[in-house]
Amino acid sequence: GSRQVRLVGGPGRCAGRVEVSTSGTWSTVCQDRWDLQDAAVVCRELGCGTALEAAGSARFGPGTGALWSYVIDCAGTEESLWECPRSERRECERGA
């Protein structure tokens, strides 16, 4: 299936909680180690320009669906979140 990323729960399409879809099911991204480099890649991928902040702390709500239990570690130069290194986490805090 196609891999997608979106922002939900914010004031517009370029702000909100990060969710990813790997097989048609949307999942909330872990906020563990989520930073401005990760946010920069999502903003670039969505055509939203420069990332202003990496809110974290479930500012836009923790999400209610599935949890994508990977910690993402982008350099900030990637074109897509799917190009970023990631490591699986058994437990993580939802809501980047």
Spell out what each predicted region is.
Residues 1-96:
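Intrinsic disorder and flexible/low-complexity segments
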